[in-house]
Amino acid sequence: MSRPSSVSPRQPAPGGGGGGGPSPCGPGGGGRAKGLKDIRIDEEVKIAVNIALERFRYGDQREMEFPSSLTSTERAFIHRLSQSLGLVSKSKGKGANRYLTVKKKDGSETAHAMMTCNLTHNTKHAVRSLIQRFPVTNKERTELLPKTERGNVFAVEAENREMSKTSGRLNNGIPQIPVKRGESEFDSFRQSLPVFEKQEEIVKIIKENKVVLIVGETGSGKTTQIPQFLLDDCFKNGIPCRIFCTQPRRLAAIAVAERVAAERRERIGQTIGYQIRLESRVSPKTLLTFCTNGVLLRTLMAGDSTLSTVTHVIVDEVHERDRFSDFLLTKLRDLLQKHPTLKLILSSAALDVNLFIRYFGSCPVIYIQGRPFEVKEMFLEDILRTTGYTNKEMLKYKKEKQQEEKQQTTLTEWYSAQENSFKPESQRQRTVLNVTDEYDLLDDGGDAVFSQLTEKDVNCLEPWLIKEMDACLSDIWLHKDIDAFAQVFHLILTENVSVDYRHSETSATALMVAAGRGFASQVEQLISMGANVHSKASNGWMALDWAKHFGQTEIVDLLESYSATLEFGNLDESSLVQTNGSDLSAEDRELLKAYHHSFDDEKVDLDLIMHLLYNICHSCDAGAVLIFLPGYDEIVGLRDRILFDDKRFADSTHRYQVFMLHSNMQTSDQKKVLKNPPAGVRKIILSTNIAETSITVNDVVFVIDSGKVKEKSFDALNFVTMLKMVWISKASAIQRKGRAGRCRPGICFRLFSRLRFQNMLEFQTPELLRMPLQELCLHTKLLAPVNCPIADFLMKAPEPPPALIVRNAVQMLKTIDAMDTWEDLTELGYHLADLPVEPHLGKMVLCAVVLKCLDPILTIACTLAYRDPFVLPTQASQKRAAMLCRKRFTAGAFSDHMALLRAFQAWQKARSDGWERAFCEKNFLSQATMEIIIGMRTQLLGQLRASGFVRARGGGDIRDVNTNSENWAVVKAALVAGMYPNLVHVDRENLVLTGPKEKKVRFHPASVLSQPQYKKIPPANGQAAAIKALPTDWLIYDEMTRAHRIANIRCCSAVTPVTILVFCGPARLASNALQEPSSFRVDGIPNDSSDSEMEDKTTANLAALKLDEWLHFTLEPEAASLLLQLRQKWHSLFLRRMRAPSKPWSQVDEATIRAIIAVLSTEEQSAGLQQPSGIGQRPRPMSSEELPLASSWRSNNSRKSSADTEFSDECTTAERVLMKSPSPALHPPQKYKDRGILHPKRGTEDRSDQSSLKSTDSSSYPSPCASPSPPSSGKGSKSPSPRPNMPVRYFIMKSSNLRNLEISQQKGIWSTTPSNERKLNRAFWESSIVYLVFSVQGSGHFQGFSRMSSEIGREKSQDWGSAGLGGVFKVEWIRKESLPFQFAHHLLNPWNDNKKVQISRDGQELEPLVGEQLLQLWERLPLGEKNTTD
């Protein structure tokens, strides 16, 4: 066969492709092979290689070999494709014998930096004390060794099935003969339904067959009537029956049950009932139960006998193909053999009939026609033509069309121009500063950057600016003048030029030019500044296409890894119109081109919808309008426009009723939707695809279909789940159209072209093929026969998922201890199957219950389960502002998880104050996402209560499981336990992040850890700088996306090595996990053996602790032994809690948790990580913690009052990071060392985590957030002592126990409740002396008094036995003797309603004269009791 041997670059199609051959299919392949430079090889070779590699990826082999007959070009193609698929390829041999092998990554090819863990003295002490009091018992030890043989499966199975029966199951009832139906007002309506004519035929066919398919158009009445036909027939013939009818959604199950009960004139809960998770209305009389697919599945998990008393199962809406319905059918097909009397009815609106006929073996199909009313359809081009819709961008496009052709010509010249062959249009003046250092975000009070309205539109730019920008871009391109970037950045910042500025003669942006020239660090800087990676030049090329065309492979990787994570579906319309638009009329084609040019297909055009809605409301007859939108975000956005923002509607809201339909919505709203509106009022319904089939609104005449749906998809090889917006299927589009013709002829407006409609998929991809399967594998274990492997059971599904994906999921469940080696569920596994979140998040939540920090973890887990609440603005300057908001929420904690938590808490506060809309806009948050997270939290907490993890009162109640919620180190431990194995290690020497299988991992630009510098212009070596700034060597992350050689992580948190050592790896460690120094030296250091003699000597005295294939720690023997024992204590405690969630805690349990908390807190502190305040607050009307963020930037010289400082975001996050840590960090962030920011210590009385910060221009920063002290005047100055001319203040301090007072007297410290901190701090700064008088509750005495000698810090003490205390402050004890209350009987406090001084609550202030008299009483104590402390 002929082979073109040249490797000439071909011009990729507009919109970017390259690649030639088909891109590898399958979940992992998607568009990922697009990075292949267009290597010219035969099409059939490409296809063959693609298929071979795809089989290899999903198969069992570790390695495959390609024949030596390949040419070098073909080998190049294979190398490149392998790389893009995450495989390792190598060529060996010479000349004609040169052959190529491809291997899967197993982690062995990554060399790792040594993993160490140095414990502080306090940590060792805490663990030693625990182990001395409660040594690890033999029982605990043996229970934590790997199992060597399988247990008695049947016994365990029975016991655990019993245990996990708590909730969400259908009751066992017995079949009975139904009662006679009552007559109702709906009878005539029922008889008018199309399904009614077929009543006898349907009943007869169901009697004669085990399985029946019923396909009826939407609104034909099949959902409500078929179950009633069965009931009526059984009543007539005196036959007992019991029917389950499943719905894909909770809302539908309730709505249909209520409607059917009403049609039979019964109350719900009699013959007709419903059951959804955590809510049911059923009684012993109930014969027809509507439930969700999930509830029926959970019922079947209790054993096959649960269906022995059921006569009919109806699975409705089968076409939705959600994973539960596919999964249910798999199980039901098995059960039909076991229960000969059981009948299965599948009903659906649009069904892939042949698939199901094949699946159930030639079962009969009944077709029911819909209603006859005609529905006119209008596609996008018709809408644009008839309504004359245009927007600013469309007008601009029409104007610029001629210019575009000119630009394309200039671009072509640019591409062919060799370097320096052009004279630059103008010699630029070199006026460039070293911009990067100049612009620190802190110089101008932060927000100011973004307040200068957003970037100027190119039309508003002055001619000199346009000329200057053009000259810079031309120089960069034509002369590879990398220095010109400094000027570009300078103009973007100082002149507000958009980062997406287009060269006026070629339309190229800075990002395209940098990508084409291969300037990697500038590409990174531009992306960090918010440059749009999807922006296209006049020839349709994006930056990615520039990089491909000019062979810049590193940049191709970079851009692909970035856009792979942007959650973009594949929605681009304009390329479709260009390639296939030949059968459109010229006018339509132009209209569509102009429209697509003006609007981003990754969104929903709410402007166009408002335009249409206005037209309908003003020119059409009455009738409800149903608008299909992809998700809750768009629903809320459109609702706000109609009710508040659009004058055309907002001024006459009495003429409209707006309803929202979404599966997470309250059921009450849904009932209102079904009612007819008053005369003269138009109903407008905003809905997701739930209104496609599940809920029928009769009076809809107009449908507006956005044509999009949000779909969760999962890349099984990368373990990444994304919520993507995708085009709906043809079947869905037809369904949606059918919603309009229910009561009279209607119109369906489709916001997509005819061409798009023709290119849509026929049916939606089954969820089973695009969802993470861990959750499903857990359920499979409970459904499948005892000895049936999970993969075998799932292979029986109507469309089974690939075996490799199932295997990966099972492997992951074993890794997180949900399953053992034999695929049997562990105690943890049974509980995880019960929780409505993915298993790793379930584990995180259960660990939080045991660590008693549930609340923050509930919020974080639900956010991770749903989606990131931060929205990505389109404008670059806004992207930077959004990033800063995210940063501000992290409060310097090196944690994206913190940003999620605090954003949610701040939103709740704003919500309780009634300004959540403005709050969300200001902070780039999605109101809709927050509302859904609240719903998920409630459901998850409900499930924990149902399973006994959270009790109603007493030990284990909601307060108890939140004892440690304020301690961020403990919260992070629960995160680590849930996120394992998603860990990354910092290689300090090479400044890279490494993972178990990745040599090089990068921060995703959306992570707050990616830019610790807070520069407006990110530094050129951004990643290295970010890694350098990390305070610890370990990170956890939520997801990693790979594109070629680059792995990106997002949603990360920095954690201490001790957290990894205790909470990562399997609970059951092999007995040789700990290797003492002698044996360790013989084996050499795993993966780390070094050539240098010196290193061997230093490591020879160290022990090794091996947690899994990758986590091999090298540490001193004592530390290794202590940590191993602490691990064992934790894991055996966790196991006990899983076995008996509601059992009271023992002394050992409490001591173990206390020790763990002490260790985590000490190590966190020694790493220099901040302990932010307020993270443990429960969702409730919130405290001053979240004052409106507007006050975040204060004038530098105003002295902060304590009222201002409570909000810990008062100062910029950067300052927080710059604050000195309480004790030296393990790796002091290099950047601060270099810049000499760490100043000498302040006065001895002062807490050490303040430093007076001087900025480069010597204007001082606001004081660090952690302390409300005024900024100190000069470097190293003493902390100002309280002023002598100020008043003296007196406060009563109540203590719950005497031990705390003893500690206070020994150590000279005290802590009070957060509510008292504010007033004490204020008193400390506003008075000369603050006296504290102590009294132990119930003792009848005052136990002495002290003077407050420092303000209250953020640091907490682990010494106090009481929960809920705030930061530590210093006190000087003056008297320590007890003064009986009777000595003070005569003293009344006018500041407390003249009550006696001893009747004071904690923190009660005394009127100064009374305070002074009280202290003088100590002088009168009898001599024997005096014991002054001088």
From Swiss-Prot:
Record's compositionally biased regions (Basic and acidic residues): 1231-1249
SUPFAM superfamilies found in the cross-reference section: Ankyrin repeat, P-loop containing nucleoside triphosphate hydrolases, R3H domain
Domain Helicase C-terminal stretches: 612-784
Motif DEAH box in this chain: 316-319
Residues at which RNA binds: K1294, S1295, S1296, W1310, W1360
Domain YTH: start-end pairs: 1288-1418
Residues with Phosphoserine modification: S1089, S1090, S1092, S1202, S1263, S1267, S1281
Annotated Gly residues bias: 14-33
Low complexity compositional bias, start-end: 1191-1200, 1250-1264
Tissue expression: Expressed in testis. Not detected in spermatogonia next to the tubule wall but is strongly expressed in spermatocytes, suggesting that it is up-regulated in germ cells upon entry into meiosis.
EC number: 3.6.4.13
One Gene Ontology term from the biological process aspect of the record: oocyte development
Positions with a binding annotation for ATP: G216, E217, T218, G219, S220, G221, K222, T223
ANK repeats: 506-538, 539-571
Catalytic function, reaction form: ATP + H2O = ADP + phosphate + H(+)
Effect of W1360A: Abolished ability to bind N6-methyladenosine (m6A)-containing RNAs
Biological role: 3'-5' RNA helicase that plays a key role in the male and female germline by promoting transition from mitotic to meiotic divisions in stem cells. Specifically recognizes and binds N6-methyladenosine (m6A)-containing RNAs, a modification present at internal sites of mRNAs and some non-coding RNAs that plays a role in the efficiency of RNA processing and stability. Essential for ensuring a successful progression of the meiotic program in the germline by regulating the level of m6A-containing RNAs.
Subunit field text: Interacts with MEIOC; binds transcripts that regulate the mitotic cell cycle inhibiting progression into metaphase, thereby allowing meiotic prophase to proceed normally. Interacts (via ANK repeats) with XRN1. Interacts with ZCCHC4. Associates with the small ribosomal subunit. Interacts with RBM46.
Domain characteristics, as noted in the entry: The YTH domain mediates RNA-binding. It recognizes and binds N6-methyladenosine (m6A)-containing RNAs.
Protein name (Swiss-Prot/TrEMBL): 3'-5' RNA helicase YTHDC2
Organism from which the protein derives: Homo sapiens
Lineage: Eukaryota, Metazoa, Chordata, Craniata, Vertebrata
